[in-house]
């Protein structure tokens, strides 16, 4: 009898340690998501240069969606995991599930819009980009990112369309742990699984892959063009022309920006693809996927909500500078230098019948100087820059 009591006590102690470790991990994930996404939103609101970049409107809206996930969805899921019971009633379970689907879908829609914005900026002429990405169109795209997901979240879930034909399976799953506790179980039938997964993940993912492929091809073509210009300049003059130097810089800037967004998209797909693949497969194998696998894949997706801000900090120079200014209490070292002194008119130069002049601020020997640069006619170079 004493041996049995000792085993029971040992198991309870092990479970207590497990719960402490699990709670600590989930708390770190939630806190990281809240603080990181708040930092992104504050950075864009305070930094005038970040507000001028149209892509950042989508990034702020994406950060807001991730912030809502970390505040309205993740804490209740963490409490359910630690306490091994859902104590908030069936109606709030439906609301929480609807918010989960809504915000997850909104996140990937935002990433799709960001990829389309970068496609028009890098692969099209500047005039085409300005005509395509007008303030009205940006507002409509942002509205669509929030409104369209409601048709696969609140509407079908509140109406119970997702559980038609599988109510008995759901009831068994709710009480599978013990007779005195229930879980907030979200299971879907075959029609809803296919519709939700295709709309929320597979179609946007395909659009993003196509957009970034075209960006990669365009960047490669312009890299070859600039290399040819540099070789031609080297044969005629020993010193590289400002046009070639600035064109190369702008091309590299846009290419790095595209790579940054590709990394963000890749991390999103890595985090959410296992869930969406399982979501579409499970109904066709009689719901035999273990609950532990579902939970692991779901929280892998939640981790993405706290991952994007750190990707911006490490891969984007403008965001990194804005973060440092906020965290270091407006330290003057991290602020952009103003252009001081009187400006001298820049001389114009004609290349292939087109005249282009640009004044820029550069660092030279620890001092900031205003200089003139010649810009090349290129859809990649002329696209709206993302400072990386």
Curated annotation (Swiss-Prot):
The chain crosses the membrane at residues 20-44, 55-78, 93-117, 134-157, 189-212, 258-283, 291-314. Its main location: membrane. One of its GO terms (biological process) is adenylate cyclase-activating serotonin receptor signaling pathway. Keywords: Cell membrane, Disulfide bond, Endosome, G-protein coupled receptor, Glycoprotein, Membrane, Receptor, Transducer, Transmembrane, Transmembrane helix. It is a multi-pass membrane protein. Serotonin binds at residues 100, 279. It holds the Pfam family 7tm_1. InterPro entries: 5HT4_rcpt, GPCR_Rhodpsn, GPCR_Rhodpsn_7TM. Glycans are attached at residue 7. GO terms for cellular component: endosome membrane; glutamatergic synapse; membrane; plasma membrane; postsynapse. Residues 1-19, 79-92, 158-188, 284-290 are extracellular. Disulfide bonds join 93-184. Residues 45-54, 118-133, 213-257, 315-388 are cytoplasmic. It is found in: Cell membrane; Endosome membrane. One of its GO terms (molecular function) is G protein-coupled serotonin receptor activity. SUPFAM superfamilies: Family A G protein-coupled receptor-like. G-protein coupled receptor for 5-hydroxytryptamine (serotonin), a biogenic hormone that functions as a neurotransmitter, a hormone and a mitogen. Ligand binding causes a conformation change that triggers signaling via guanine nucleotide-binding proteins (G proteins) and modulates the activity of downstream effectors. HTR4 is coupled to G(s) G alpha proteins and mediates activation of adenylate cyclase activity. Belongs to the G-protein coupled receptor 1 family. Specificity for G(s) G alpha proteins is determined by the length of transmembrane regions 5 and 6 (TM5 and TM6). Interacts (via C-terminus 330-346 AA) with GRK5; this interaction is promoted by 5-HT (serotonin). This is 5-hydroxytryptamine receptor 4. It comes from Mus musculus (Mouse). The lineage of its organism: Eukaryota, Metazoa, Chordata, Craniata, Vertebrata.
């Amino acid at each position: 009898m004493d041996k049995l009591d000792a085993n029971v006590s040992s198991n309870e102690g092990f479970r207590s340690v497990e719960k402490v470790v699990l709670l600590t991990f989930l708390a770190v994930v939630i806190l990281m998501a809240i603080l990181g996404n708040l930092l992104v939103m504050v950075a864009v609101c305070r930094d005038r240069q970040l507000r001028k970049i149209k892509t950042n409107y989508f990034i702020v809206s994406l950060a807001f969606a991730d912030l809502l996930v970390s505040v309205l969805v993740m804490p209740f899921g963490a409490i359910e995991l630690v306490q091994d019971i859902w104590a908030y009633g069936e109606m709030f379970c439906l609301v929480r599930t609807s918010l989960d689907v809504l915000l997850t879908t909104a996140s990937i829609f935002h990433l799709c819009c960001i990829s389309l914005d970068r496609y028009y900026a890098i692969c099209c002429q500047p005039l085409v980009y300005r005509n395509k990405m007008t303030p009205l169109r940006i507002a409509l795209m942002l509205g669509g990112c929030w409104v369209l997901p409601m048709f696969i979240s609140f509407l079908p879930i509140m109406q119970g369309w997702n559980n038609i034909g599988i109510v008995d399976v759901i009831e068994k799953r709710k009480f599978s742990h013990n007779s005195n506790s229930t879980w907030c179980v979200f299971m879907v039938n075959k029609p809803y699984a296919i519709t939700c997964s295709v709309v929320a993940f597979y179609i946007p993912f395909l659009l993003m892959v196509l957009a970034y492929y075209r960006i990669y091809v365009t960047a490669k073509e312009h890299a070859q063009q600039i290399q040819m210009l540099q070789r031609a300049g080297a044969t005629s003059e020993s010193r590289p022309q400002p046009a070639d130097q600035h064109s190369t810089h702008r091309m590299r800037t846009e290419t790095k920006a595209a790579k940054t967004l590709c990394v963000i998209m890749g991390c999103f797909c890595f985090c959410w693809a296992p869930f969406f693949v399982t979501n579409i497969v499970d109904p066709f194998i009689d719901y035999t996927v273990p609950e532990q696998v579902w939970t692991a894949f779901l929280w892998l997706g939640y981790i993405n909500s706290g991952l994007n801000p750190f990707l911006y900090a490490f891969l984007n120079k403008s965001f990194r500078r804005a973060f440092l200014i906020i965290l270091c209490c407006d330290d003057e070292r991290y602020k952009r230098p103003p252009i001081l002194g009187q400006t001298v008119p820049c001389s114009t130069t004609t290349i292939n019948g087109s005249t282009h002049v640009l004044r820029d601020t550069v660092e030279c020997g620890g001092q900031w100087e205003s200089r003139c640069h010649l810009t090349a006619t290129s859809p990649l170079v002329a696209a709206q820059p993302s400072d990386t």
